Amino acid sequence: LLSLSGYIEDSGLDDLKNFFEEKIFPTKNLIDQGDYKLNQLSNIGVLEIKSLLSAKMIYAHEAGIDVTIDIPDRVDGFSIDTVDLARVLGIFLDNAIEAALETEQPQMGLNILQNQAGVSIIISNRFLDNGAGLHKLKQKGFSTKTGHQGIGLSNAQKIIRSYDHVLLETTIQCGCFIQHMELAARKE
């Protein structure tokens, strides 16, 4: 978006059109060809979240990760602030991508399920188990990655704790790291 705004502010419409055709349109063509399993993202009715998920899943696929996306029903809203949700999802997806790339068979999945109780978001990825317990991974300052500050998951936890109707369950099963977030529907 920043690059688009730069073209709009500094350049003419022709430059913006060229940028779109060279950088953005090829991605659309790849999606249309079915190389990516992104068609289910059309079920996300919140543009900011759909854009974030698209960008992360395209990046993961291009990095060589086997990506699975399952969003069977339309989701027109989430019961938390869009910016907060984008921050949490960005952290979870970045971590999932990095961890999956460390494995011999990188895989990750995104499931978003709408039901009467609210929305479930499940992000899973294969990872190399280095023996760090789940409680350590969530501590501020702890990172399994060299040169990282270890604040991502702790920041995500802080955001999630600020909502009394959002629950996060983190589990490890069969070589997969799973983040399962439940966003309960708000009572009106």
Q: What label would you give each PLM region?
A:
Residues 1-28:
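A conserved cytosolic signaling coiled-coil/coupling helix that links sensory/transmembrane modules
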Residues 150, 172-180:
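Glycine-rich nucleotide-binding loop
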Residues 103-117:
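Short beta-strand/loop element within the Bergerat-fold HATPase_c
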Residues 18-25, 39-63:
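Short beta-to-alpha transition helix within the HATPase_c
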Residues 119-150:
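Glycine-rich/acidic phosphate-handling loop/turn and adjacent ATP-lid/helix
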